A protein has these predicted regions:
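Catalytic histidine neighborhood in serine/cysteine hydrolases
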Residues: 199-215
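Conserved alpha/beta-hydrolase catalytic His-Asp/Glu region
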Residues: 107, 120-173
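Catalytic histidine-centered segment of alpha/beta-hydrolase-like enzymes
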Residues: 212-225
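Conserved HGGG/HGGXW glycine-rich cap/lid loop of the alpha/beta-hydrolase fold
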Residues: 1-42
Length: 239
């Protein structure tokens, strides 16, 4: 299983959020790569935009799977690449899980609203990312999110971000077992585009979670674990 993190972080956030749900699945090998320009993965000048990153990720998927079917999951920008990979490799991707996906056609993105916690807790990045401002959420932010910022290649991110939208794929929608999870209070990507996208897929479970924003994997971990567990069960049923 290949799990792709979001923008401005590295594999540590994805691993912290997905691993509790996947650790007990027998025989499931999880791979958490750093996307180009984050963590320990360089972003050479040949990567000019998202289409180039997608091609690199498709090669990675082919390499780590050896051509066998594999699962794909992603959060935020990682979900954007994951759904594109599934569209281009439908016979190879056995299941797709998207959490707070960045997607074309964003609409009705809500204003940021804090639902609980202490005023003034954490730094500006924390307060803009989380809708639960509690000591527990701050601890997760400081452990899994903030340290990755120092390893981001800002110049590379700006270069690739200038061409962030992928070239549309002409094929049919991905038809494998899919999970789409969105935060109702997500002020980064909203939930409307995720709802639209899930509606276009023939075998998608959609969950729009209240009291959760773009940091949904941190804010609603038990619910995410349950949804991922059900998704894995569906994948096994299809196998």
């Amino acid at each position: 299983m290949l799990v792709l993190h979001g923008g401005g972080v590295d594999h540590r956030e994805a691993e912290a959020c997905f691993e509790p749900a996947l650790d007990g699945v027998p025989g499931l090998r999880r791979i958490y790569p750093d996307l180009p320009g984050t963590g320990r993965t360089a972003a050479p000048d040949s990567l000019r935009g998202s289409d180039d990153v997608l091609e690199a990720l498709l090669r990675l998927g082919d390499a780590v799977s050896g051509g066998s079917p594999y699962l794909l999951a992603g959060h935020s920008a990682g979900a954007y690449f994951a759904q594109a990979m599934a569209a281009r490799r439908p016979e190879q991707v056995a299941g797709l899980a998207l959490v707070c996906p960045l997607l074309p056609g964003l609409r009705d993105v809500p204003e940021h609203r804090v639902v609980a916690g202490e005023p003034g807790l954490g730094d500006e990045e924390f307060r803009g990312y989380f809708v639960l401002h509690t000591a527990a959420m701050l601890e997760r932010y400081e452990r899994f999110v903030a340290p990755s910022a120092a390893l981001v290649d800002v110049a590379a991110q700006e270069r690739m971000g200038a061409r962030w939208e992928l070239t549309p794929h002409p094929g049919p929608p991905y038809a494998g077992p899919t999970l789409v999870v969105a935060g109702r209070l997500d002020s980064t990507v909203g939930y409307a585009a995720a709802t639209d996208f899930a509606g276009s897929l023939p075998h998608a479970t959609l969950a729009v979670v209240d009291d959760a924003g773009h940091a949904l994997p941190h804010e609603q971990p038990a619910l995410l674990r349950a949804l991922l567990a059900e998704w894995v069960t569906r994948v096994h049923r299809w196998a």
